């Protein structure tokens, strides 16, 4: 149908990226500043769902569905995809926003704009790793200009490992390994003074 094809045709040329999120359209809402109803793009709402999920739960929870994906202030949708339309949109990286009786208007997809199959084609996985990477970066920055010795490496591990245990306890990851010892800090690396670590996380 024309609506589905128009949405797919718009997003198809856009580059593949796990840092982007595509949705299916516009909501009809009241514009109190101009005292009239108008159609507004949903991308601001999708960003708001992610912020609300981070505040009320954690960044690694999906912002979609009846529990966390409710679109506020929407009277109706310009395009309310049916099941068959959703089946066409979702493989094309487009997250449908739909009206569901009993739930209202909700985000009904969790895809990033990544064009290949990967763990990072899910919004919650990408946001999990953004959170983990930022914390590890801060921990590493705190060790700048310190000696590459057991004490410095222990300080780094004492920041990172409890954080990852907490993420695991809160259902963000299933397991993790952090290696920061003599196996990946060889004498050559120690002589040149950077601290090397290996981090493996299973979402």
Could you describe each region identified by the protein language model?
Residues 1-200:
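Structured, hydrophobic secondary-structure cores that serve as assembly/anchoring elements
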